[in-house]
Amino acid sequence: MKRSGIINREIARIAAEMGHMDRITVCDCGFPIPDGAKVVDLSIIKGFPRLIDVLKALREELIIEKIILAKEIVDKNPEMHNAILKLFSDAAVDYVEHSEFKKIAAVSSKAYIRTGEATPYSNVILSSGVDF
């Protein structure tokens, strides 16, 4: 058994397979995930687990050089927006329309991690960096 860090087998595997600029999407319980996509569904009930808790765990495992957010989060969910920015304060941030966000996720995500989050626009695309 691992001593620390992510113990979910699928997420640990995805994290280990991430290369520079690879992307994963961490999403709320209502996000439309394309058929055939690799998905780790952590959702149990609405609100659990929370998106921010999953992001905190991933932040400990991965180097994130950029995040992509739907620009609607700024006005529709400022509390979540601020929490995400605080967590990834050293990463570049791109904002796109929610419809564009879904397209980017569909074509560029190695995997989706579905949370129980049930607040508006609580979806993040994480782009992996390198430690050298």
From Swiss-Prot:
Q: Where along this sequence does the record place binding of substrate?
A: 28, 98, 121-123
- The question of whether Isomerase is a record keyword is answered with yes
Pfam families assigned? RbsD_FucU
> Which coarse location class describes where this protein primarily resides?
cytoplasm
What reaction does this catalyse?
beta-D-ribopyranose = beta-D-ribofuranose
What keywords are assigned to this protein? Carbohydrate metabolism, Cytoplasm, Isomerase
Please state the Enzyme Commission number of this protein.
5.4.99.62
Question: A single GO molecular function, which one?
Answer: intramolecular lyase activity
The family this protein is said to belong to: Belongs to the RbsD / FucU family. RbsD subfamily.
What gene does the UniProt entry assign to this protein? rbsD
Q: Which lineage ranks, top first, belong to the organism behind this chain?
A: Bacteria, Thermotogati, Thermotogota, Thermotogae, Kosmotogales
The UniProt entry, under InterPro entries, shows: D-ribose_pyranase, RbsD-like_sf, RbsD_FucU
Q: Which GO terms describe its cellular component?
A: cytosol
Q: Where in the cell is it found?
A: Cytoplasm
Question: What is the official name of this protein in its record?
Answer: D-ribose pyranase
Q: Name one GO biological process term.
A: D-ribose catabolic process
Its pathway, per UniProt, is: Carbohydrate metabolism; D-ribose degradation; D-ribose 5-phosphate from beta-D-ribopyranose: step 1/2
Primary role: Catalyzes the interconversion of beta-pyran and beta-furan forms of D-ribose.
Q: What is annotated about its quaternary structure and interactions?
A: Homodecamer.
Q: Where is the active site?
A: 20 (proton donor)
